[in-house]
């Protein structure tokens, strides 16, 4: 085997940009490490904000340190880093190529809010008449508006319209958020956009999801409303 050699030695292009799939604490720290090493990084996060599951925690085990005190400075650092690009409310659509030269299609889902105009004042969420949607951030223990930011420290601090629960998209009526938006950032005509980028490396940091306790009958999770998870 040691005598084997390629018939024609060749070189392959290496794109000096990395893709991190997942904007939780693992993805954020990975992006910061790569960016601090001098390389451009894109973070693709499927929810409207980076932060991931750690943003939902009160304290961390075993030291019981404040979760937000650890996470939010890193969120701010990642968003302000000159070599990190955030693709929030986006998903990887297609990956082709090979190590050193990947081509990736990223679907930027329509927020129905112009990020370049929005000031993050929150008036649209306050005035929205549709407020009965279970909050994903609070694991269904509370409700949110049809136009919302996931949590107070969200980055970017730009709301997204949940079209399935928006009166405007379902009936053609309402439009109150557009009327109260002083910045004129509401855009009901916004559509998904496909962005194609090239990368030399891809890091998958997609995190975890909560176990479905309704599969464990001994806890009566699906029959007793007073049984909740931690």
Predicted regions and their residues:
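A short, basic/flexible loop-to-alpha-helix module at the beginning of a structural domain
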Residues: 1-18
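Non-heme iron-sulfur electron-transfer modules
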Residues: 6-9, 47-73, 87-117, 129-165, ...
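A conserved hydrophobic secondary-structure block that centers on an alpha-helix together
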Residues: 13, 29-32, 189-192
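N-terminal Rossmann-like FAD-binding beta1-loop-alpha1 element of flavoenzymes
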Residues: 18-42
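Glycine-rich Rossmann-fold phosphate-binding loop(s) that bind the pyrophosphate
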Residues: 22-26, 121, 206
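Conserved beta-strand segments of alpha/beta enzyme cores
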Residues: 40, 83-85, 226
């Amino acid at each position: 085997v040691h005598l084997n050699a390629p018939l024609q030695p060749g070189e392959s292009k290496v794109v000096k940009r990395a893709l991190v799939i997942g904007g939780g604490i693992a993805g954020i720290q990975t992006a910061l490490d790569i960016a601090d090493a001098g390389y451009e990084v894109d973070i693709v996060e499927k929810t409207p904000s980076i932060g991931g599951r750690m943003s939902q925690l009160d304290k961390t085990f075993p030291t019981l340190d404040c979760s937000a005190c650890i996470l939010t400075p890193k969120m701010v650092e990642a968003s302000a880093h000159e070599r990190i690009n955030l693709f929030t409310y986006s998903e990887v659509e297609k990956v082709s190529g090979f190590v050193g030269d990947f081509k990736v299609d990223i679907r930027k889902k329509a927020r129905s809010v112009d990020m370049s105009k929005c000031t993050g004042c929150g008036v649209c969420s306050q005035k929205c008449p549709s407020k009965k949607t279970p909050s994903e951030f609070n694991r269904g223990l509370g409700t949110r508006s049809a136009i919302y930011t996931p949590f107070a420290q969200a980055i970017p601090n730009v709301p997204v319209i949940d079209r399935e629960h928006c009166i405007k998209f379902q009936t053609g009526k309402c439009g109150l958020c557009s009327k109260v938006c002083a910045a004129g950032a509401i855009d009901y005509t916004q559509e998904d956009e496909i962005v194609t980028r090239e990368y030399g490396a891809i890091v998958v940091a997609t995190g975890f999801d909560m176990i479905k306790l309704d599969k464990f009958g001994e806890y009566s999770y699906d029959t007793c409303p007073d049984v909740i998870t931690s």
